């Protein structure tokens, strides 16, 4: 869960990019500086936060490459305080998001944030309950959190995706090599081979906006 302030974030450039590439999403989202927002700034005539702009780019990537997002059932692994679920359901009212996280404090924050925002098309699910979801999950998303986990912590999530037979997986890693986390702060082994081992094949890869490059990856489960 991101709770810091990244002072080098290119707010103005990102607003210009989002206004050019995803105007509907940018117009649909507002920032009031309330729960979950550590820094709100005025840029290019709009009050924004890093989380708002990142959400525009992430949802825009899914819109371009995943058919049926408007009515998809989404599993958000590492949901944090719930900002992705809030903004996905705000821009796609027919979608539904299951929010899960291995940290209990994140799930508590997520529940309170959803209640504060009046989000009705999302629900918090404890990790041990995810495999019991009976509705079909169309896509799972993991935005940065697996880069903060060990391979041993990632594996159970992938096993759960196997159980649920989730056809698509979107991952936004910290680094292009999908480095995992280690206790001493050094880069751990890549978790990309584990994704492949569970039958997922990379079908879309995008390096993100020039002003804030990162890796957006969409995988499809092989038949």
Where are the predicted features?
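Conserved Class I S-adenosyl-L-methionine-dependent methyltransferase catalytic core
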Residues: 1-69
